[in-house]
């Protein structure tokens, strides 16, 4: 039982995306941008090429997103940067997409002659898929909720939780049993106080009425 917040309408979460953080570091060669530009290998320029490659990995139809969220590099405008790095957030809905993305990052090769790429990181949460076991687990929870007069619904999210790990191990998992609210990570993040007694009653019922 995972007491992550419910969806805004109170739904449990029967699927979550897997999450990865990749760091891609480009190694080039520094030089004076005006006097000796031909001697330099621009690490930021190398990353620019790689960003365009990574854009091609995203697949909205499969729920796969690839987001360059952080980029760092350079020291001064008149110095060709020797090193630059970017941190890339990836979200996937299935294990097959997880494998595809992992392989794609590991196979990145530099575009600029003499440049070198280093890839670190990877997936830190597998996807929580809405498979047959997940559906059966939710249906049992819905039946128990009905005894309390609650009409339990389901949905999913692109964020990860501890439930990603248990579900991937084949353990029956219920996620989103926590408070009902909205605005996660935003200035208007809030919890509906009137939802707390109902959520507590639901968790208590699941603990006491679930039979193996």
Q: Which role does the model predict for each range below?
A:
Residues 5-10, 14-15, 20-212:
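Metal-dependent amide/peptide-bond hydrolase catalytic core
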């Amino acid at each position: 039982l995972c007491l992550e917040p419910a969806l805004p309408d109170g739904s449990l979460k029967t699927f979550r995306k897997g999450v990865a953080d990749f760091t891609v570091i480009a190694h080039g060669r520094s030089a004076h941008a005006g006097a000796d530009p031909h001697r330099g290998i621009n690490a930021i320029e190398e990353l620019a090429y790689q960003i365009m490659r990574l854009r091609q990995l995203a697949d909205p139809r499969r729920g796969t997103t690839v987001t360059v969220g952080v980029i760092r590099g350079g020291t001064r405008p008149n110095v060709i940067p020797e090193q630059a790095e970017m941190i890339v957030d990836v979200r996937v809905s299935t294990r097959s997409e997880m494998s595809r993305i992992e392989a794609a990052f590991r196979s990145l090769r530099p575009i600029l002659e003499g440049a070198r790429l280093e890839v670190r990181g990877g997936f830190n949460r597998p996807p929580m898929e809405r498979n047959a076991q997940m559906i059966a687990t939710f249906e049992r929870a819905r039946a128990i909720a009905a005894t309390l007069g609650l009409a339990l619904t389901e949905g999913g999210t692109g964020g990860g939780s501890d439930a990603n790990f248990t579900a991937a191990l084949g353990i029956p998992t219920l996620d989103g049993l926590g408070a009902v609210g909205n605005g996660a990570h935003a200035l208007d993040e809030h919890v509906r106080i009137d939802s707390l007694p109902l959520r507590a009653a639901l968790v208590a019922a699941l603990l006491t009425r679930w039979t193996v």
